[in-house]
Every structure is written in structure tokens, then in C-alpha cells.
Design a protein with these regions (language model features):
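Catalytic loop of the DD-peptidase/beta-lactamase superfamily, centered on the K-T-G motif
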Residues: 1-128
Length: 128
């Protein structure tokens, strides 16, 4: 919520708005974040978040460079945790979402599609 609120937390300002803007911008220049090949298949599958869509890395989060089929606009922030916990922060719309599981391996066949469906449903509901 603090990132969505330009640095304001529940009990007051945590970061300056210009700091939030800076930490949300591409920090790698022309480098893009590709998919990955696992070295530990018991913990993580090989994969890519939204293959075919350009993604870069801010100082804090992955940034999708283009709009995604879920409805998430370009410039939104996201990342994930090893037990299939995914989140996104859409500063343009003022929306954030989180999908938490405790399932291994990472990017398992049910968690990732569940998350994508959740995010898509949120944006479809907002479009009504």
C-alpha cells in the first residue's frame, strides 16, 4: 500500500514520492529480464513470467514494459516468492494484488495459472 500511496504508510510518510518514482523505474537500461532454467527442480521449475512480453528490472521490482493480457498496464511492478507467492503493484490504476500459496516447486502447474486467473478476474471486474 505504501508504494501505491506514493510513500505514505498507514502511520505516515515512509518514503518521498520522488523516491517511490525512482525505485519504480527501469534500473538496468536495455537489459531485459528473461526466463530462467532451474538448477534445483525440486524447488523451482524452469519458466518465465508472461513469456513473449518485455520485462525489465527496477531497483526493487520487476517491471512489465508492455501491457499484459491480464489487464495489467505497462509500467506495473511485480515479483514472487519461492512457495508460489505472487504480487503486483499497479501504480497507474492504484491497485495491488497478492496470491499466496505454500506449494513447491516454484511455478507449479496449478499455482501460476491460478494467479494469472486471479489477476485477470480483478481487472475484468474493474472494467465493469
Amino acid at each position: 500500500r505504501m508504494i501505491l500511496n506514493d510513500g505514505n504508510g498507514t502511520y505516515g510518510r515512509v518514503l518521498k514520492p520522488e523516491t517511490v518514482a525512482a525505485l519504480s523505474q527501469n534500473g538496468l537500461g536495455a537489459l531485459k529480464t528473461p526466463g530462467w532454467t532451474t538448477s534445483m527442480p525440486n524447488l523451482a521449475n524452469s519458466g518465465d513470467f508472461f513469456p513473449g512480453f518485455s520485462k525489465s528490472w527496477a531497483y526493487t521490482f520487476q517491471v512489465n514494459d508492455t501491457a499484459l493480457p491480464t489487464g495489467r498496464p505497462a509500467g506495473s511492478l511485480s515479483w514472487a516468492g519461492i512457495a508460489n507467492s505472487f504480487y503486483w503493484i499497479d501504480r497507474q490504476t492504484g491497485l495491488g494484488g497478492m496470491w499466496n500459496t505454500q506449494i513447491l516447486p516454484f511455478l507449479d502447474v496449478s499455482s501460476w495459472p491460478g494467479y494469472v486467473n486471479f489477476e485477470t478476474t480483478v481487472y475484468q471486474h474493474l472494467a465493469r
